Amino acid sequence: MNILVINCGSSSLKYQLINSESEEVLAKGLCERIGIDGSCITHQPKGGEKVKTEIAMPTHTQAVAAVIEKLTDEKVGVVKSLAEIDAVGHRIVHGGEKFASSVVIDAEVMKAIEDCNDLAPLHNPANLIGINSCREIMPDVPMVAVFDTAFHQTMPKNCLLYTSPSPR
């Protein structure tokens, strides 16, 4: 199973295509300066050289399209078509107290992420843009949200609430 992992920022998009069975990174890259003059994509297939291409990316949707183009490219691509991408995992900075693990993205999850925008105003709105952009390009591919804050949900309560070591 090939999983496209996306970390979407306000003007950048990092990605890796990972084979979940072998855990190998098939390709990775970075779209920079999205919505700004001089935007480019740097793409590196497994075992290959980094390829940097200047390309106009006025929106995140165009950045996602550029990623798919590189992943399926005849020379530097690692899959033949979009059909070989089985799911997309989105790194989400803040899920509040609602999410203790990764979840399949639906309308309720989108609303809950949006409700946390005040907790991560530089990140969550960009994460939502990334999800919507991927949905536009890959409407039939399952999308999963992976929350930074879920890590903290599994900590013992005393470690979560206090910064000092717990008494022995």
PLM regions and their residue ranges:
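Short glycine-rich, Thr/Ser-proximal phosphate-binding strand/loop in the N-terminal lobe
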Residues: 12-57
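Short beta-strand-loop/turn "lid" adjacent to the catalytic site in phosphate-handling enzymes
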Residues: 71, 77-123, 144, 151-159
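Conserved small/polar residues in nucleotide/adenosyl-binding loops
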Residues: 162-167
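Extreme N-terminal starter segment of soluble prokaryotic enzymes
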Residues: 1-3
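A structured beta-alpha segment of the ubiquitous adenosine-cofactor-binding alpha/beta core
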Residues: 53-81
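Polyanion-binding loop/helix "lid" in catalytic or ligand-binding cores
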Residues: 123-135, 146
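A short acidic Gly-Thr/Ser loop motif
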Residues: 6-11
